[in-house]
Amino acid sequence: TYMSPTIDVRTRKREKSLLGTIGLTLLGRQTFFVNDYTAVGGKGEVAFTSAPIGDIEVLKLSPTRGYIIQKNSYVASTPDVNLDVQWQGFTKGLFGQGLFMIKATGQGTLFINTFGAIDKHTLNAGETLIVDNFHLVAFSDTCQYRVRKFGGLKETLLGGEGLVTEVTGPGDVYIQTKNVKELVDWLWTLLEPRVQSRAR
């Protein structure tokens, strides 16, 4: 939303290889290009906002601590953070419901956003949390995970795929308090009568 005059902005392809760029664009729905912000000739400041109405969380990465994040939650990162597009959770969409996850590793800072507030849970070793996939934002790569259907056939037919992720610690899990699907469904209850009346 704003930046200091000392900030130099340069645009480049997000990945070094064309295949990596295409993979991140098609599967992750991220842009081909990314802006690099560098302070030149003195200190500088840059402010970012997220598209959804919600919080922005700052995650610190190290060689022994990375994160698995929802593709749409990515906002920005420092240069030494690597976004892995070859990870199976990204290339195969293991989380279902169009939910592709990106594995972030390296040394640096990662900024993620949520729809609604961020609810952080710290899991001890062996402790498990079951999370609705539409509310899952990120979790530590030290965690184990398993995606499965929730409920019976009736719930699946009425509620969609009905997938949840079981995340087992040790590590942190970040959950968003709102989800876009529920917002769209609610908006449609308001818009549907008008659409139908105009279609007659």
Feature-to-residue mapping (PLM):
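Composition-driven recognition of glycine/serine/threonine/acidic- and proline-rich low-complexity segments
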Residues: 1-200
